């Protein structure tokens, strides 16, 4: 199975690296086109477009200016270690071993507004450009139009390379909208994580993001290859609820956290 996750806004380029293996991102020619557009933006443009503070806008204007076509361990780091945030807190990539990284390299992909699709060990320079950003570009008025079929085609290549036709969608709606499911050569299965709150089970964003990361780790660590085995996921108290699940949506619940 191939796992797809969202990226994170929070980045870490400081922590010691737990692996020195790296690969090069494959869609840099596209990233370059977006960087050229982003370099025309003023800090005020960035603040308004991304709905961020002046400080974050300044930081990202600087990142766009400093971005280089050459990706090296000096100006970039592996995507799976650079992304932080709730999904990556659940994934805990910094405690994976070399065999796990090799497995993830084949079975995990990260969607990205700037890089399109990243393998875990692909070098990534720091950026902020969410997929939902309404950035006018040579191909349209937003990033969904910019990426078109490119991400889906890359996913199809990865699906063939890893050996079956199952894609586990652990990405947010904002990011999975960049994928065209009808053009995917795969059965898409979306796990849903619901937490109890005041007697009701619902998707709580913070918990759901972390759970998506935990499930990605569960698949990687246990080399899960069947959907039946995926339903055994029980990290952090989640359990599979068969009667609420369908062939394409797996529902997991958890009792209230105190």
From Swiss-Prot:
What name has this protein been given in UniProt? Answer: UPF0246 protein VV1_0535
One GO term under biological process is: response to hydroperoxide
HAMAP family from the xrefs? UPF0246
Q: Which PANTHER family match?
A: PEROXIDE STRESS RESISTANCE PROTEIN YAAA, PEROXIDE STRESS RESPONSE PROTEIN YAAA
Supply the source organism for this entry: Vibrio vulnificus (strain CMCP6)
Pfam families the UniProt entry points to: H2O2_YaaD
InterPro entries (UniProt xref): YaaA
Q: Name one GO cellular component term.
A: cytosol
Q: Which domain of life is it from?
A: Bacteria
The record's similarity note reads: Belongs to the UPF0246 family.
């Amino acid at each position: 199975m191939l796992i797809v996750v969202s990226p994170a806004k929070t980045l870490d380029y400081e922590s010691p690296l737990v692996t020195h293996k790296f690969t090069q991102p494959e869609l840099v020619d596209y990233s370059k086109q977006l960087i050229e557009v982003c370099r025309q933006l003023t800090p005020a443009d960035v603040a308004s477009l991304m709905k961020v503070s002046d400080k974050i806008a300044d930081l990202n204007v600087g990142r766009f200016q400093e971005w280089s076509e050459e990706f090296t361990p000096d100006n970039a780091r592996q995507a799976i270690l650079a992304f932080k945030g709730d999904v990556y807190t659940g994934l805990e990539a910094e405690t994976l071993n070399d065999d796990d990284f090799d497995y993830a390299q084949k079975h995990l992909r990260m969607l990205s507004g700037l890089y399109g699709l990243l393998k875990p060990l692909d070098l990534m320079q720091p950026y902020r450009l969410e997929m939902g950003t309404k950035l006018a570009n040579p191909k349209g008025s937003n990033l969904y139009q910019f990426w078109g079929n490119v991400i889906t085609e890359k996913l199809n290549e990865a699906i063939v390379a890893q050996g079956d036709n199952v894609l586990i969608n652990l990405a947010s709606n904002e990011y999975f909208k960049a994928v065209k499911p009808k053009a995917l050569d795969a059965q898409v299965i979306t796990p849903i994580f619901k937490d109890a709150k005041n007697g009701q089970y619902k998707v709580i964003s913070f918990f759901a993001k972390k759970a998506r990361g935990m499930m990605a780790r569960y698949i990687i660590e246990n080399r899960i290859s069947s959907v039946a085995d995926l339903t055994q996921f029980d990290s952090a108290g989640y359990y599979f609820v068969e009667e609420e699940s369908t062939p394409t949506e797996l529902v997991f619940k958890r009792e209230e956290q105190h």
